Amino acid sequence: MPAPRPRLQQIARVLAQRVDSWVNTLTGVGTATGKTNVAFVPNQNELLSLVDCENLYNFDGVAARICDAVPVNALRGGFTVSTGDAEVESAIHAALDALNATERATRAWTWGRLYGGGALYLGIDDGLPPEEPVDEARIRALRWMVDVDRRDLYPMTWETDDASPRFGQPDTYRLTRMGGTASETVTVHHTRIVRFEGVTPTRRRRLLLQGWGESVLQRAYMEMQAMRGAFAAAGVLIQEASQGVLKIKDLMDLMAADTDDVIRRRLSLMDESRSVARSLLLDADGESYERVETGALTGVADIMDRMVLLLSATTGIPVTILMGKSPAGLNATGESDIRAWYDTIAADREKMLRSRLERVVRLALISREGPTGGREPSGWKVQFPSLWQSTPSEEADLRAKVATTDAMYIDKGVLTPEEVALSRFRKEGWSAETTVDLDARRAAQEADAAAAAQHAGG
């Protein structure tokens, strides 16, 4: 009967070769007996549920910062809509403020990163029920917009036409809106939804996620565990780094004589004298007290910094942003890292924000009660402010340079004083962007040419 053992050993070797992890059978790393095997072999039990994600966001500051960092930084200065007409731009800005567009978009993007899916539900007044596609020709107004997450938005029907560019995507959703003690469930067409996702999953994984993305916390979860464990262990080491030792003559004889109460009273008296008199009262002949260093903490800070760097590498967020300051002893973060981070944010603005915000803005523009009365300006576009924040000195220097340029343009006839005034001093504040109404310019030129021709003919 012992014959099958070689067969079992062969199977074990094959399984060891196929395990999706780093394995060292000599040290035990990655094996069932290794101390770090959990950190190397992710399995189905380690997948974060939506409840896990919510708890991490609510009760773990680092997890919340991972989810918040990109949306908050990308939209901290809001966004503007450029049309070439300062008055129209101010009206659009006021309409978007009334919708609370910047805050709603920030939340929806945050929920997308936290849960793998978030969305804006648009209150489009076109006279149709929400389960019907939006009829752009009938839009009276964009009444409101609310942010929801994937738990509130469940795909009901899917696009099954393989010739459609939306093949395999949700066509309608079941939306559950929670409010107070009641909830409301409605069916909503995808044209009334603006989706935000987290990490892009594989095609098969997306099917399991019901068409949504993956939480950004999923990939960083093991690193977060390791970092939290390291900080907790460091706290224990600090508490145990120095231990007080009290030597009492004939202690073993006292214990053998069943005088525990005497020993307890002595220790209590020692603590009281240390707290009240800030000194120790000892028997000069039979007692002594000293503090003993139980271990050095050299190198602990470096190890903890490396764990923070690993979490930073996993999330793509610089340590300066993730932890609020650079790790001690490391030159891993600085201005170059912040610049690279801002470049990443700028790319995310283009990838995640621009098309979604442009859709919201366009629906507001073509609505009959919107800021432009239903007339969509030609050539309008969404613009984002610089991520770099100027100091007061830099701001004053910029304004001085812009004023010099404006004076030159006015002197040469390139701009009019009215155009400069409307461009610089807007309702939302000072702006370095210059807007010129080219249509008005052409109309004025044509009128001047017609007047000149009439004068010459007369």
Language-model region placement:
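N-terminal-proximal low-complexity accessory segments that begin disordered
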Residues: 1-75
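Surface-exposed polar/charged interaction patches
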Residues: 14-25, 29-32, 53, 69-76, ...
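Structured, mid-chain assembly/scaffold modules that mediate subunit interfaces
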Residues: 51-209, 371
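Short, hydrophobic/amphipathic alpha-helical patches that form generic packing surfaces
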Residues: 61-76, 109-119, 218-243, 313, ...
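C-terminal amphipathic alpha-helical
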Residues: 101-121, 255-258, 263-267, 293-399, ...
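Extended, charged amphipathic alpha-helical segments
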Residues: 190-333, 337, 389-393
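Activation/maturation switch segments at domain boundaries
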Residues: 287-289, 296, 339, 395-458
